[in-house]
Amino acid sequence: NANGTFVNRLNKPVAIEGRKLWTNLPAGYPAVDLPNVTFALYRRVQGSGEAFDFGGAPIATLTVQDWSGLKNYTFRLLYEGKNIIDDGAGTVRPESEDQPGLPKYTEEGKLYEYVLREEGITGANGLPLDGTGEGPQESLDLFDIQEISNTFQVENVFHSPTGSLSVKKILELPLGGDDLPIAYPAVRFHLYRVYIQNNGQPSAQELVRTATWSSEEVEAAYRQRGDSTTVETVLSFTDLEQYAPNGSLYLYHVEEDKSFLGGYDTWCGPGDLEAQDVTGGGYTVGGLLPHEEREEADATFLNSRKAVQTEFITLTGQKAWEDFYDAF
């Protein structure tokens, strides 16, 4: 200045950049429906010999409520106090306008050393998803938190509990004139699931598995039954995830593919039913939740041909060729 005195200020703020690794997620799971995560930032004076005070209040926190705008799940902390990311653009904002930036140095010019820790992960229903709640009704254990030493990188490994669903298929085979089945149609089932998104709306249905009872297997079942023209089997779906990564229950439904069942009518219903008890129309049974394996089926499907063609007609005709004055 005019008096020849230079003033050096050490108030240049620092940006702490971190990265989140999500592993073992279901294929194609959207970033917008990932859980809310809160990070805590602690600091100490470099070279002071002091330990980080993880039992005390952090210098800053960051809550990410929308991961869709964060490329490679990279985020930043810019302010002391609460930092928030809650839009699809990944913008960091302070909780209040008067929050200062993160200092790089102390007032004495000593360098601060920062460390980042993940403090909590919560689902769309507000429950902790890392098993930190006080009871099974107050938390879900869906993620393992793995913090990588000496970096601002945290990994969450998804591991939903799994269960099974099974479908009972009853197929009535119509006989032809020779008292043998006209055909042995193959049977195919598709298993779909949905969950409640972070916005409170159901997700689009996702095809999870397909199970087939082949024509050869249907014929083998018929030959094992002897005189009966009604055959049945149970098809199972195992290792089905019970929860989506945001903590919402996966709700499954099974649908019969009627591509191979021309001329057959279909009835279905929830539960392990006998043929005479399957009275519901359609070809889909929903509202299914995976569970531990058991003998009873979760849904029953019945196929039968109401009317079998027993009378046939013969068509005859004559073909006339015009062959260019008998040249051929």
Give the location of each predicted region:
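Solvent-exposed loop/turn and edge beta-strand elements of beta-rich ligand-binding domains
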Residues: 1-328
